[in-house]
């Protein structure tokens, strides 16, 4: 679209939603001792930033093109045995530009029962940053890891061990236009 209409197409954004599908308890975490943990499966709706537009900044923590918003963490915590220890904007993750890219988010998620759980990851923009347009800078790539620093895959089912919460850094959108014109 950018090649056909460069003055109308936004910079690149987070791409797909960052919806961690979490599950735990008997039979749901194949390589972990689950003990008497409560069985659960829950999908969380969260995302990073959109790309900046030709005349406006990108939207922070908002999906493009649908505009899907985030699920309040209190809802997730009330329906599954998880606790969200952190949910912040990922400062400066949007690319610089005359119009800056939207910022991503940082989330840290653990079991409220101190039990292992699993994540079914399907995240994009981990290896390739959302590109800026017309001189705008790229947004930050996403990260999927444990709070201990162990890097996880951005695709596939993986176990989050007891006592080492999941740490997600969602991408920021690319900037649009020369940052010196801001």
Language-model features: where?
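Glycine/proline-enriched, intrinsically flexible loops and inter-domain linkers
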Residues: 1-182
């Amino acid at each position: 679209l950018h090649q056909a209409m460069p003055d109308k197409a936004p910079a690149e954004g987070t791409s797909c939603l960052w919806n961690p599908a979490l599950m735990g308890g008997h039979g749901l975490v194949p390589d972990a001792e689950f003990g008497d943990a409560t069985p659960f499966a829950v999908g969380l709706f969260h995302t990073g930033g959109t790309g900046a537009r030709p005349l406006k900044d990108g939207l922070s923590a908002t999906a493009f093109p649908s505009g899907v918003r985030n699920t309040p963490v209190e809802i997730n915590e009330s329906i599954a045995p998880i606790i969200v220890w952190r949910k912040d904007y990922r400062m400066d993750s949007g690319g610089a530009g005359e119009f800056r890219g939207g910022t991503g988010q940082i989330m840290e998620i653990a079991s409220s029962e101190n039990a292992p759980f699993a994540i079914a990851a399907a995240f994009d923009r981990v290896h390739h940053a959302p590109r800026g347009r017309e001189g705008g800078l790229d947004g930050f790539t996403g990260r999927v890891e444990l709070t201990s620093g162990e890097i996880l895959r951005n695709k596939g089912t993986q176990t989050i061990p007891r006592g080492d919460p999941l740490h997600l850094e969602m991408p920021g959108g690319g900037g649009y236009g020369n940052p010196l014109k801001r």
